[in-house]
Amino acid sequence: METSMARRAQTSLTALAALALLWAEPALALYPKKGDSDPHAGVRDARRRAIQGIDVSRWQGEIDWEKVKDAGTRFAFIKATEGGDHLDPMFRRNWAAAKKAGVARGAYHFVWWCRAAKDQVRWFKRNIPRDADALPPVLDVEWNGHSEACGKKIPREKALAKIREMLKGLEEHTGKKPIIYTDITFHEDVLEGEFNNYPYWLRSTAAPLAHRYQRKQWEFWQFTTTGRVPGITGDVDRNAFFGSESEFAAWRDGRYDIGARKWLRGEPKVAMPKPPTTPAGLRAPKAAGATPLRYVPPGKIPRSARAEVETTGSIVRD
């Protein structure tokens, strides 16, 4: 009896915990297979976002992209090139397999600050095919502190000049405005206040982006490096898109500029709601202790009442 009661109690606790998790992160209700080997409470908002994605490189090894797609992965940024002479050995395989599985994918280039911008653009163009169905390219800008040969920081203005040249080159090659990926340190050192019309993909794995960046706007959020997704062995970076299904679809179709938050074409028509009507035979409701409320179209507020509305915010009454 005690064992049975304990088992029922444990089952109830497990169910309550699951319900609490789904309430906090509704996206998990749609894609419960996604996870994190070391989740952080500071990025809960990213896990709530409806449109989830990943970024991958050779470190993820062989990927079963069909399983990745079935787990609800909507997009993937795939490492392509680095510097002026390195191609990720898994790029071509990932590029083809992700498309076949129906995962929207884009290629990213990792910048080396000791290589000329023109050499890096040339290398990217040589290895990344033009594909009208692909997501815009990504320019990954971080300091190369891990490199013995290229670890020194360069002056801010020199870094900005290189970035400008590479953004231009990537856009000329693909016909799409590139995305800028960066981390907290590089953004603070170089990017603060720059390239505001470009989409930004920002990294923050332990706190909301607003706690780490002065930038008020973001388009993609890399919120964990310890994500778990079916089809991938071990940890993988997980990312969230800022907007809605319609914004994601319009961005993919080239109708919406997410960096500038501007419709390029096909802006949806939003119908203005009609004022409420009172059915025949019924009287309009009264506010407590007051006269009946009356709908007044915009611009038709009586002059005598307008001053009161402007100073008190009161609704117009008969």
Protein language model features and the residues they cover:
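Bacterial N-terminal signal peptides that target proteins for export
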Residues: 2-13
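Hydrophobic core
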Residues: 17-22
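N-terminal signal peptide c-region/cleavage motif recognized by signal peptidases
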Residues: 24-26
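Functionally critical loop-and-helix segments that line ligand-binding/catalytic clefts
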Residues: 31-53, 195-309, 316
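Substrate-binding cleft of extracellular glycoside hydrolase catalytic domains
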Residues: 40-63, 78-164, 171-173
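Residue-level detector of anion-binding/catalytic polar loops
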Residues: 74, 104, 177
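Catalytic domains of cell-wall/extracellular-matrix polysaccharide-remodeling enzymes
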Residues: 136-214
